[in-house]
Design a protein with these regions (language model features):
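A short, N-terminal "cap"/entry segment at the start of jelly-roll beta-barrel domains
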Residues: 1-39, 121-143
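Conserved short histidine dyad/triad with adjacent acidic residue
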Residues: 27-30, 43-58, 93
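Short, conserved beta-strand element in jelly-roll/cupin
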Residues: 44-48, 57-73, 112-115
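Short beta-strand His + acidic residue motifs that chelate non-heme Fe in jelly-roll/DSBH
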Residues: 53-56, 73-74, 91, 96-103
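A short hydrophobic beta-strand segment most commonly corresponding to one strand
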Residues: 63, 90, 104-123
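Short acidic-glycine-tyrosine-enriched beta hairpin
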Residues: 77-94
Length: 143
């Protein structure tokens, strides 16, 4: 058994999400990064209003569990979906997608995924444009 104690500094401190992966302010609290042979990664991800991921995919898929606020998610070519606390989202392996907060509300989710044999958890693509985020006219501002 291994216990990792919570601390204000160190390996489980909150970090700001990198600009290469996110638009807007996103903060990440690591929950689990289990040592091999486990492949599990878990992060509590905090999106400020309007913040979102870039397009990306996961070699082994991803599960999201919304804990606070109201969010948006979309798979490439699909409609923008509104997600709320208690909602669970499963993203298929290699499915391009993005997720984030609505323009007027924050959103927090628990992100669960695994690393592949090369220790890769995600493949990052281009940023989601404002037109893509706004659904080319879809009104998500009241969500």
């Amino acid at each position: 058994m291994q216990i990792t104690r919570s601390s204000a500094e160190g390996t489980n401190a909150t970090t700001k999400g990198p600009a290469e992966w996110f638009t807007g302010d996103v903060y990440i609290d690591p929950v689990a990064a289990s040592p091999a042979p486990s492949r599990v990664l878990a992060n509590l991800v905090h999106f400020t209003p309007g913040a979102r991921t870039a397009w990306h995919s996961h070699p082994l898929g991803q599960s999201l569990f919304v804990t606070e606020g109201i969010g948006l998610c979309q798979r490439r070519g699909g409609p923008i979906e509104v997600i709320r606390p208690g909602d669970r989202v499963y993203i298929e392996p290699h499915e391009e997608h993005w997720h984030g907060a609505t323009p007027g509300r924050l959103m927090v989710h628990l992100a669960l995924n695994e690393v592949d044999d090369e220790h890769v958890a995600a493949h990052w693509g281009e940023h989601v444009t404002d037109d893509e985020y706004n659904g080319a006219g879809t009104d998500t501002s009241q969500e």
